[in-house]
Amino acid sequence: MQNIYYFHGFDGFLTHEKRKILENFGNVIAPTYNYRDAQTLTQIKESFFEKDLKGSVFIGTSFGGYVANYLSTIYDKPNLLFNPALLFRTLKMGLDAPLTSSLQSLSYFVLGEKDRLLNYGDNVRFITDYFKGPTEIIIEKEMGHHIPPNIFDKQADNFFKMIAEK
């Protein structure tokens, strides 16, 4: 059974409903993080040094998408990112993965057209400029920053089907 590492958004958490959706696809590991603590990102990064990541995937929403993307870049693992805060990568955040890595694993982005916090167009430009591996970009026209369970379920299902085909 594959491990699914889920990273929530800033001041967020994985809801019970979304956890149940992900449990259909594997073993869900989703601690709650305090991203306000400057050491949190370093602790997350260091916690993966010794892990066996065979068959693992990274999933994140908003700021958790930034973290999940960082880890998937370092370890070349598939990632599913909902409204990821990718533009934070341009700030000094303690995560120094190269932006232009050529990955073999899929990066699957779900962006809300109605997101008022993270502009989907900025994310699309960033993704097309910097991501060199296989990417899939989905624009959900009715989605804002928060991801409704039905969209989360549909896109998780699509993502896991795509990585199963590889």
Language-model segment annotations:
Residues 18-19, 94, 119-129, 152:
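Short alpha-helix in the alpha/beta-hydrolase fold that links the catalytic acid
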Residues 102-104, 109-115:
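Short beta-strand/loop motif that positions the catalytic acidic residue
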Residues 59-68:
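Gly/Ala-rich beta-loop-alpha elbow adjacent to hydrolase catalytic centers
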Residues 9-10, 31-36, 77-89, 112-114:
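Active-site nucleophile loop of the alpha/beta-hydrolase fold
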Residues 1-53:
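Active-site catalytic motif of lipid deacylating hydrolases and related acyltransferases
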Residues 31-33, 136-144:
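Short glycine-rich catalytic loops that host catalytic nucleophiles or stabilize transition states
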Residues 142-153:
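Catalytic histidine-centered segment of alpha/beta-hydrolase-like enzymes
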Residues 12-13, 113-119, 145-146:
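Acidic catalytic loop of the alpha/beta-hydrolase fold
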